C-alpha cells in the first residue's frame, strides 16, 4: 500500500512560532544570554537546519568573549548540548499544554489514509520526544500509535539531505513512487525530492515566501470542509483539490507523478545542515 509521510514542525502543527521560538527565547533567558529572537530573526535562523546548529550560529568570537562563554570546541559542544536539553524540555512542556493544535486537515486526511490502508509515518530530524508529543496532540494518542516515527538522531544528516526520507521508505518497504511526503519548507521539499518522493507543501508561518519549485502541490493547508479551507498556491498536476486536499487527490497525484519526468530539487534553495555537523548527531529544532 502507499505511504503518507509527514514532516513534523510546521506540518502537523504550527510549532515554530508557538513552540520552538518561545522555547529558544526562554532558554536564552534561563542561561543568562542577552538574546531574544524576533519573528524576523527566527525566520532567518530557520534557514539553518537543526536547533543546536541555530544556537551555534550565534557563537561568533565577539559574542563568545562578550558573554564569557567557552571558546574551545569541546566546551562549546557541551554548552550547546545543555542549552538544547533545556530548550527541548521547555518546548515539550508547551506541547503538553495543548497550546499548539494540529493544522487544518491533518487529523482528517490521516483518518482517510488509515481507512484506506495507507501506511502512516513521520520523518523529522527533530527530537523524537518532541515529535511524538506533537503527533499525539495532532491526531490523538490512539491514531498516533499507527505511525512509524523516524526522528532524532536516526540519521546523522539533516534536511535538505534526503537521508531521513530514504530511511523511512526503506523501513516501510514502500516503492518511492508510492509515497507522498507532506512538508512546509524548501529544505524539506528538497529532502523529499532528493529521495524520489512526490511532495505536497503546506506553507507555514515562516516559509510562505520560499521557493517550492518541484512540489507536486503547494497549498495554504490541507483544509477542512466547512472549516479552514485549503487554497491552492501551485498545482502543476492539475489536481484542483478544492476546499480540502483529500486522499483521492493524493492517489491521483501518485498516478500523474509516476508518469512525469523525475523532478530534481533546485540547488541552493536553503542552507544545508553542513553548518555545524560536528556539534551533534542528536537533533533537533
Model-derived features with residue positions:
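A general structural motif
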Residues: 1, 117, 176-178
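N-terminal helical cap/lid subdomain that shapes the substrate entry/recognition surface
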Residues: 1-8, 12-104, 115
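Substrate-recognition element of Asp-dependent hydrolases with the DxDx(T/V) motif
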Residues: 24, 101, 106-136, 192
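Asp-based, Mg2+/Mn2+-dependent phosphohydrolase catalytic module
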Residues: 111, 127-285
